[in-house]
């Protein structure tokens, strides 16, 4: 696919950055914000939508309720009745509010006089209450990226959702350990005009948040939601972008999807002379189960054995439309299939542009065409499944196909790991918000503002200069400044330097962990506690700094206790080093006799393989050089 001209397309992108705050307590109770894999029980919920304060039911909430799911919640040991929705929320976490106010100050936002906590209806099971508590803290402001001002619309403080553990067709299991962790949400204006600019803005906001020293790190602690539109399209919400580097690809693919959908609309209307009314009036749907009684298609056989039925739906003039690619490996037919999976919970759908295939023969395709009365330019969709679900599926298929005459549907999509997206649910509306009646309004006074000033992040340029003054090279200082481990670096440097150089700490965090990953290590196990265990051993002269790299490799590949691995790399004495070198020299005396001091590179490699960082590299080199110089030659 050729690259699109985003300025001509009128691309507009807004970001919603969600970041967990690193506070000791949750937003509305005193429970710990540490995730806990252990639990002492479960509770069960069925959730249903409620009317908003204006008497309406939100479409997204209605969509989730119609799934009829049961929700189970693991109760960790650090959980209380607030998370189970058996007790009213306590007062809002003052520390979390101060951090959000500090971010608002740095973004030049207008802080509200009084904070009102609202309930945002969410009944996908991620909140036991059926709603998420959220509150606007500031509005307006800006972030400057490469000289361009990107507007900030709102800054909010809200509670994070429960952590999903597993999911099946009928029930979803969550853990309550994440529910209620304070979360800052920063929403930008749709001022971003290229995919690459979106990544830079997200990075800049993420950097600002890290510079507060009060945000959590790791998978799931930060996510970016995108709002993307082009001229003639609509604002599409894309949820759950976990990796910063995926942002440009996702935006490119969404812009392409909207562009292709608008092209389909233009072709149907202006080139094929069709309209929604014409196609709708000539839709034909028939049960076609009898045509596939002797099929060789494994997919169809499986459904028929379960008592499923097959229906065919004719769409006048749609030949070639279902197979039209909207983004890499995702076609218009894929969009319809996504709708059916999400809205009717059926997976068996085929369209005329991909058949014969999947074990469906050309003879079976011709039989379908004959039964449905398919003309030369017509298309059809086959859908397979349970009779009751088929009713919903057929309705949704017709709705989505006919929407091709409108263009781009207003929907919420979910980001996939390959940079594409798929339909998630209808877009929520204004009917999902109403006031939280259990929490009184919170006045923003001088005391909370003064508290917030202690968290206002430094300017990145100022922070970079300070890192360089600590002895780091500009390159290493920049890596640490941009690293999610910046706060850990500062904490360890304050605690262990000057005895342990900040350069060693920074190199460990930025280079040695990457080295462990390159050697096949699972670096997710390298926690802050593991890093500190290693730095502490170095501080107490138990290990050499040259052993850190190998310790991390061994730990991330073996998963043995870190203390055991550190003990294996304990410093050797000078006497032991001398014995090792003498032994290797004696074993390689023939090479030394042949090459003399030129044999050094061979010998040092053998020595290092035995020493494995248990002595400082310089000491090993100097000792070997001296011994080789005085080694007797024949």
From Swiss-Prot:
A GO-annotated cellular component: cytoplasm
GO function terms (MF aspect): aminoacyl-tRNA ligase activity; ATP binding; glutaminyl-tRNA synthase (glutamine-hydrolyzing) activity
Keyword ATP-binding found: yes
Keyword vocabulary terms for this entry: ATP-binding, Ligase, Nucleotide-binding, Protein biosynthesis
InterPro entries to which the protein is assigned, alphabetical: Asn/Gln-tRNA_amidoTrfase_suB/E (IPR017959), Asn/Gln-tRNA_Trfase_suB/E_cat (IPR006075), Asn/Gln_amidotransferase (IPR018027), Asn/Gln_tRNA_amidoTrase-B-like (IPR003789), GAD-like_sf (IPR004115), GAD_dom (IPR029351), GatB_C_1 (IPR042114), GatB_Yqey_C_2 (IPR023168)
Reaction catalysis annotation: L-glutamyl-tRNA(Gln) + L-glutamine + ATP + H2O = L-glutaminyl-tRNA(Gln) + L-glutamate + ADP + phosphate + H(+)
Coiled-coil boundaries: none
Swiss-Prot/TrEMBL GO biological process terms: glutaminyl-tRNAGln biosynthesis via transamidation; translation
Transmembrane regions listed in the UniProt entry: none
EC number: 6.3.5.-
Keyword Cell membrane carried by entry: no
Top-level EC class as recorded in UniProt: ligase
Gene3D superfamilies hit by this protein: 1.10.10.410, GAD-like domain, GatB domain, N-terminal subdomain
SUBUNIT field: Heterodimer of GatD and GatE.
Family note: Belongs to the GatB/GatE family. GatE subfamily.
Protein name: Glutamyl-tRNA(Gln) amidotransferase subunit E
Taxonomic classification: Archaea, Thermoproteota, Thermoprotei, Sulfolobales, Sulfolobaceae
